Design a protein with these regions (language model features):
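N-terminal alpha-helical targeting/anchoring segments
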Residues: 1-99
Length: 99
């Protein structure tokens, strides 16, 4: 398992927990959700499109969903230094230097 697969699994667990708490609707499958290498002009280590994939189902803008999900991702992982939300709704993760 590589770092992108690891963080994709973490993100899936987080959104599943939000679903169980009634805070977020999720599809039957996680098709289309990814965690990947960000474009070179972004200062982050991983980028995910989770908010964009879930926005239509939740009837919220991708930016609104990303703003809701991103602090929860950061709270659950002590290796994350910063999380930024960028249009149209990507969540960009930067790790602490020790990682």
């Amino acid at each position: 398992m590589n770092i992108f697969e690891l963080y994709l699994d973490k993100i899936k667990l987080i959104i599943s927990d939000l679903n169980k708490n009634g805070e977020l609707l999720i599809p039957d499958t996680f098709n289309g959700i990814n965690a990947e290498i960000p474009p070179p002009n972004f200062d982050c280590d991983i980028s995910t499109n989770v908010a964009m994939v879930l926005s239509k189902l939740n009837k919220k803008s991708p930016l609104e969903l990303a703003e809701k999900i991103s602090p929860i991702i950061k709270e659950k992982d002590s290796l994350i230094d910063t999380i930024n939300v960028v249009k149209p709704g990507f969540i960009n993760i930067k790790f602490k230097p020790l990682f």
